[in-house]
Amino acid sequence: MRPLDIVELAEPEEVEVLEPEEDFEQFLLPVINEMREDIAALSREHGRAYLRNRSKLWEMDNMLIQIKTQVEASEESALNHLQNPDDGAEGRGTKRCEKAEEKAKEIAKMAEMLVELVRRIEKSESS
C-alpha cells in the first residue's frame, strides 16, 4: 500500500443545510404519515385475522358436535339392535345386512367429516 497524497483527497461537497422546519416538512412528515397509515392497516388486518380464526374455530366446533351426535346416535342404534334382536329367522339375515350397510354408510360419512375437519385444521394452521 502506498500512502495517500494530499492531492488525491477529494474536497468535501457542500451540502445544503435545511432549516429544521423545512427538514421536518420535507422529509419526516411524509414518513410519519406513511407509518401511521401502515399501523392503521396492520391494526385492521389484525382484527380481521382474529375474526377469521374465531369463525374457523366455531365452524370446526360445530362439525365436531355433528360428528359426536352421529356417533352417539349410531351407538344407541347398535345398542338397541343388540337388546331387541329380530325374532324371525328368515328376515333376520336380510335385516342385519341392511343395518350393516346403513352403519357402513354412517361410518363412511363420519370418516369424511373427520377428514374434512383435519384438512380445515391443517389449512388454518398453515395460514
From Swiss-Prot:
Residues 76-97 are annotated as: Disordered. One of its GO terms (cellular component) is nucleus. Residues 92-126 form a coiled coil. InterPro entries: MRFAP1. Keywords: Coiled coil, Cytoplasm, Nucleus. It is found in: Nucleus; Cytoplasm, Perinuclear region. It holds the Pfam family MRFAP1. The keyword Coiled coil applies. The keyword Cytoplasm applies. It comes from the Eukaryota. Its main location: nucleus. Belongs to the MORF4 family-associated protein family. Found in a complex composed of MORF4L1, MRFAP1 and RB1. Interacts via its N-terminus with MORF4L1. Interacts with CSTB and MORF4L2. This is MORF4 family-associated protein 1. It comes from Bos taurus (Bovine). The gene is MRFAP1.
